Amino acid sequence: MQVYAVGGAIRDELLGKPSQDRDYVVVGATPAEMEAAGYRPVGKDFPVFLHPRTQEEYALARTERKTAMGYKGFAFYCEPDVTLEDDLVRRDLTINAMARAVDADGNLTGPVIDPHGGQRDLAARLFRHVSDAFAEDPVRILRLARFAARFHDFNVAAETMRLMREMVAAGEVDALVPERVWQELARGLMEARPSRMFEVLRECGALARLLPELERLWGVPQRADFHPEVDTGVHVMMVIDCAAALGAPLPVRFAALVHDLGKGTTPEDVLPRHIGHELRSVRLLEEVCARLRVPNECRDLAVVVAREHGHIHRSLELGAAAVVRLLERCDALRKPARFAQALQACEADKRGRKGFEHSDYPQAARLLAAREAAASVDAGAIARACADNVAQIKDRVHAARVEAVAQRLGAQPGE
C-alpha cells in the first residue's frame, strides 16, 4: 500500500503557510490490512483509521456516487483498485486536490501530484471546482465560502460561481441539516476576514436561503451622520471583520453578525431611522438560533448585545443609577465574562463604520469600572441587616450599588 498526504496540507505548504489540515489517503489496502498494521477503525460511512502512534486519520482511497439530495446522499466505493487519481477527482476544489507521497516516517517525499491544476489556481488566487461532481454536495458551497474568509485575496472562478448558483436554484442548499450549516458558519466566522464568507454566499444566492434575516439588510439605509457607510449590510460586514481584528471569540463574532437584524424589518416610511430595531433584532436572532441550533453561549450573548448595544454606546452620558440598571439588565454582576464579551462586541459595532475603524471605545473601561464598584457591595451584609424587613433588601442593595458606582465614576447617584 502507498500513503499520500492530500488536500490542505499540500495547499498550505505551497502557500508557505502553517497547516492545520493533515489528511492522509491510503491506496491499495483493505480494511483488514489496515487493522493488521495496527490502525484502529473509526469511520462510520467509509473506512477511516487512526494511526497507531500519531492518532492521525488515514482514509482508504474512495470514489463516491450521488444517491439522494443533501450532503449525506452518497454511496462509497473503497476497494484496493481505487487509484489516487480516482480519489482526487472527487474532491471539491483544485487547490485541495493535490497530493504528495509519505514515507514510513511520515515525511513528504517526491513531487506534488497535481492532476487538476491546483498549483495554477493557487498562483492565480482562484477557487475552482475539480469537476461537476462539486454540485452533488451542497456543503461544498459553505466550505468554499469559508475558505474565502481564510484566503480572502482569492476569487471564485466564474464557472464555479455559476455552478453554485445552479445548485441553489435546484434546492440543494435547502437539504442541508441545521447542525452542518452552523458548523461551517461558525468556522468561517473564526477566520481572518469573515465578511468574505457572507459575500460569497450572497453572490451565489445561498445566503437568502440560509439566513434571509441577514440577506435583507443589504440596501437598507441608515443615518449617514452615524453610519457614513449607510448600507446596513455593509455595516454588519465591517463589524464582523472588526471583531475578527480584535481577536474576538466565536460568541462575540456571532453577536456582531446578528446584532442589527431588526433593521431589515424597519418600515420604509421611517427610514433611515430604526426606532425599536433592538427588540426586533432579539426576536429575529432567537428565530435564527432555534433554526440553526446555535449553542446557548452564542445565543445568550447575542441577545444581550442586540438588546443593549444602544444603551452601552450611550453609557458615557449615563449617571450612576442608569449605569447600575444597565449592569443589572446585562446580568453583569453574575456573569462578568459574558459582560466583557458584550463590551467587545459593542466596540466592534462602534468601530465597524466607515472612518471609525481605529477609534477608541472608552465606554468599555467605564462600564467595567462600574461593574467592579457595584460588585464590591456586600449584598449578604445588607440582607442580614434587613432580616426583619426582607422586602427592603432588593432596593437597599440597588441603592448601595448606585452609591458605589457614583463614587467610582465621579457621578451623582441620581443622574
From Swiss-Prot:
CDD domains linked to this entry: HDc (cd00077), NT_ClassII-CCAase (cd05398)
Keyword tags: ATP-binding, Hydrolase, Magnesium, Metal-binding, Multifunctional enzyme, Nickel, Nucleotide-binding, Nucleotidyltransferase, RNA repair, RNA-binding, Transferase, tRNA processing
Cofactor details (free text): Magnesium is required for nucleotidyltransferase activity. Nickel for phosphatase activity.
Binding site for CTP: G8, R11, R91, R143, R146
GO molecular function annotation: ATP binding; CCA tRNA nucleotidyltransferase activity; cyclic-nucleotide phosphodiesterase activity; magnesium ion binding; phosphatase activity; tRNA binding
Annotated function: Catalyzes the addition and repair of the essential 3'-terminal CCA sequence in tRNAs without using a nucleic acid template. Adds these three nucleotides in the order of C, C, and A to the tRNA nucleotide-73, using CTP and ATP as substrates and producing inorganic pyrophosphate. tRNA 3'-terminal CCA addition is required both for tRNA processing and repair. Also involved in tRNA surveillance by mediating tandem CCA addition to generate a CCACCA at the 3' terminus of unstable tRNAs. While stable tRNAs receive only 3'-terminal CCA, unstable tRNAs are marked with CCACCA and rapidly degraded.
Protein name: Multifunctional CCA protein
Organism: Cupriavidus taiwanensis (strain DSM 17343 / BCRC 17206 / CCUG 44338 / CIP 107171 / LMG 19424 / R1)
Gene (UniProt): cca
